């Protein structure tokens, strides 16, 4: 079984909105909403990975972030470890740098059914902030 380590950025602005993107139609979990992030590379820490991934995917450099949640999740074809980082200060303005649609969404507007199933506990925790 494939094992993946994923670093994810939950970008929260001063209006308590979260920046989300939509997965590509040909990606695993196609067309689902997601928090930007990606695979942790060999020799990279989760902290380094979230900085790199947010620079690559949404064009920001995190300045202040903290571990929000770490989860293990089993899919039929893969086991993933997800490191969710709450990013509250950054340089730049987030946008879909890789062509993916991106938008700010209120915490109230987050619906776990619109995201991959591994995100459900994180969305529930975010709504309690």
Curated annotation (Swiss-Prot):
Q: Does the keyword Hydrolase apply?
A: yes
Question: So which domain of life are we looking at?
Answer: Bacteria
Q: Which UniProt keywords apply?
A: DNA damage, DNA repair, DNA replication, Hydrolase, Magnesium, Metal-binding, Mutator protein
| Name the record gives this protein | 8-oxo-dGTP diphosphatase
Knockout-associated phenotype? Disruption of the gene increases the rates of A:T to C:G transversion a thousandfold over the wild type level.
Q: Which gene encodes it?
A: mutT
Enzyme Commission number(s): 3.6.1.55
Which cofactors does this gene product need? Mg(2+)
> Motif Nudix box at which residues?
38-59
Query: Which amino acids does the record list as binding Mg(2+)?
Result: 37, 57
Q: List the disulfide bonds.
A: none
Entries under SUPFAM superfamilies matching the protein: Nudix (SSF55811)
Q: What does this protein do?
A: Specifically hydrolyzes both 8-oxo-deoxyguanosine triphosphate (8-oxo-dGTP) and 8-oxo-guanosine triphosphate (8-oxo-GTP) to the related monophosphates, thereby cleaning up the nucleotide pools and preventing misincorporation of 8-oxoGua into DNA and RNA. It prevents replicational errors by removing an oxidatively damaged form of guanine (8-oxo-dGTP) from DNA and the nucleotide pool. 8-oxo-dGTP can be inserted opposite dA and dC residues of template DNA with almost equal efficiency thus leading to A.T to G.C transversions.
Identify the residues that the record assigns to the Nudix hydrolase domain, covering every copy: 1-129
- Write out the similarity annotation: Belongs to the Nudix hydrolase family.
Q: Where does 8-oxo-dGTP bind?
A: 23, 28, 34-37, 119
GO terms (BP aspect): dGDP catabolic process; dGTP catabolic process; DNA repair; DNA replication; nucleotide-excision repair
For this protein, the record's Gene3D superfamilies field holds:
Nucleoside Triphosphate Pyrophosphohydrolase
**Reaction it catalyzes:** 8-oxo-dGTP + H2O = 8-oxo-dGMP + diphosphate + H(+); 8-oxo-GTP + H2O = 8-oxo-GMP + diphosphate + H(+); 8-oxo-dGDP + H2O = 8-oxo-dGMP + phosphate + H(+); 8-oxo-GDP + H2O = 8-oxo-GMP + phosphate + H(+)
Spell out the subunit comment: Monomer.
- What does UniProt report on the pH dependence of this protein? Optimum pH is 9.0.
GO MF terms held by the record: 8-oxo-7,8-dihydrodeoxyguanosine triphosphate pyrophosphatase activity; 8-oxo-7,8-dihydroguanosine triphosphate pyrophosphatase activity; 8-oxo-dGDP phosphatase activity; 8-oxo-GDP phosphatase activity; magnesium ion binding; manganese ion binding
